A protein has these predicted regions:
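Aromatic-glycine hotspot motif
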Residues: 1-121
Length: 121
């Protein structure tokens, strides 16, 4: 079984990789595709789905991070956010999510509250 430092490094490393792949995909997406509708879901564009990722993170941060002092970034407009602004917003929400993950990994009280013991995975 991995020790706590291994678990912490693995989870935070996986988060950073996920965010990097997401932001690079958005940066490299051809502009012609940005506002295309998803087949059979005409109200959902690639822009809207990408913005939803950031806005969902904001919801998690507001719900779980506020009481721990983790700031919630501003949400973005799913219909109008330009790619560059979305990438900047994703970087802010990623930093918050990383702080939230670190909080959960580092706070023994949270482990006890959720798992009933201090034994780490």
């Amino acid at each position: 079984m991995p020790t706590l430092p291994d678990l912490r490094a693995g989870i935070l490393g996986a988060w950073r990789t996920n965010n990097r792949v997401t932001t690079e995909l958005i940066q490299r997406l051809p502009p012609a595709l940005w506002d295309l509708s998803i087949p059979d879901v005409p109200r959902r564009t690639i822009r809207a789905i990408a913005a939803h990722l950031h806005n969902s993170r904001c919801s998690w941060l507001r719900t779980l991070g506020r009481e721990h002092g983790i700031p919630t970034p501003a949400r973005v407009d799913q219909r109008g956010v330009p790619p560059g602004k979305l990438v900047a917003a994703l970087k802010r929400s990623s930093a918050g999510m990383e702080a939230l993950l670190a909080l959960g990994l580092d706070d023994e009280r949270l482990w006890i509250a959720h798992f009933g013991e201090t034994r780490r995975l």
